[in-house]
């Protein structure tokens, strides 16, 4: 089941095509990475989903229904440009945002108190937002995004301003929300976060979607069939089958080699060919990182 389907969504501004027939299918209860360089169109798509702006063409379906005003309460949105009221106290702010999303005052107070206890920030309840550090304000904004228990959560660069400890806390919360049944759209340039958290990804570049799929499928598509081998003793391999990209001495007679497979031999055949000629200590496929795939596609200008 898809939580959200975007079909040929297009958005034009006077001198700029911000989205060019972008289609996406976001599976329910997954963490979906919406990736792309600055200015690619990610934020435009997020604003359309949040009904802040409207698409010129195309449709968006949310949990099986065409997107409409009533869905605002089922979405939690953490924008990249954070929007807390500087003069307002933390507790009042959380209660206010929760009520905006349809909670009763009593429920808003109860949930706000539960969340500040969970995040160990009860001492901040009566502090004004302007007195908080950037990281503290981030926590408050995150709570206000998820407190009304939305089915779809959209996080735009959620880790900017967080130190590693708080980033870990937010990561844990995101994974818990997914376990509880939430679908999370994660817009970021931080590829290491994508590597750790996302199940599915889409890459938008120059207003078009250029890649979409599960993380495993994407990595499978961009496999380089290259292997790193640590071994004792130098060797030569059949040049028709293998290309020795690198072989360096680590110490004494101990080497680290990088080998590309030229034909369809695969890892088992490579290992069989290595065993008679060297003493293999470790053997691992070099799987491209999401960062490497991102750079290859964006710099290479590859489009579907």
Predicted regions and their residues:
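ABC-family P-loop ATPase nucleotide-binding domain
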Residues: 1-10, 300-304
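ABC transporter nucleotide-binding domains
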Residues: 4, 11-205, 211
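Alpha-helix N-cap/helix-start and coil->helix boundary motif
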Residues: 10, 68, 91, 191, ...
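Residues that scaffold the ATP/ADP-binding catalytic core of kinase and kinase-like folds
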Residues: 70, 221, 293
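Generic structural marker for isolated residues within well-ordered, non-membrane alpha-helices
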Residues: 94, 112, 215, 271, ...
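ABC transporter nucleotide-binding domain
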Residues: 171-260
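Short, charged/small-residue-rich alpha-helical element at the C-terminal edge
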Residues: 226-300, 304
């Amino acid at each position: 089941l898809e939580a959200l389907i975007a079909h040929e969504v297009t958005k034009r501004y006077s001198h700029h095509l911000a989205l060019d027939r972008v289609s996406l299918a976001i599976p329910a209860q997954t963490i979906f990475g919406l990736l792309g360089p600055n200015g690619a169109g990610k934020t435009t798509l997020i604003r359309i989903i949040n009904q802040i702006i409207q698409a010129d063409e195309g449709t968006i379906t949310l949990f099986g229904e065409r997107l409409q005003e009533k869905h605002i309460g089922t979405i939690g949105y953490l924008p990249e440009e954070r929007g807390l009221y500087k003069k307002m106290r933390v507790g009042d702010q959380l209660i206010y945002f929760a009520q905006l999303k349809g909670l009763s005052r009593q429920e808003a107070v109860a949930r706000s108190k539960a969340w500040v206890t969970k995040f160990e920030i009860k001492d901040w309840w009566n502090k004004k937002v302007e007195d908080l550090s950037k990281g503290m304000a981030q926590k408050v904004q995150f709570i206000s995004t998820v407190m009304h228990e939305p089915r779809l959560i959209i996080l735009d660069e959620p880790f900017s301003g967080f130190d590693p400890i708080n980033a870990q806390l937010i990561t844990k919360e995101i994974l818990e929300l997914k376990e509880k049944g939430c679908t999370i759209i994660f817009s970021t340039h931080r590829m290491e976060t994508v590597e750790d958290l996302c199940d599915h990804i889409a890459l938008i570049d120059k207003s078009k979607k250029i890649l979409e799929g599960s993380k495993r499928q994407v990595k499978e598509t961009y496999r380089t069939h290259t292997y790193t081998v640590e071994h004792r003793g130098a060797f030569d391999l059949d040049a028709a089958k293998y290309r020795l990209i690198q072989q360096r001495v680590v110490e004494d007679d101990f080497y680290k080699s990088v080998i590309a497979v030229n034909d369809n031999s695969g890892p088992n055949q490579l290992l069989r060919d290595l065993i008679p000629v060297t003493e293999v200590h470790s053997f691992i496929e070099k799987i491209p990182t999401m960062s490497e795939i991102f750079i290859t596609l964006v710099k290479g200008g590859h489009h579907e």
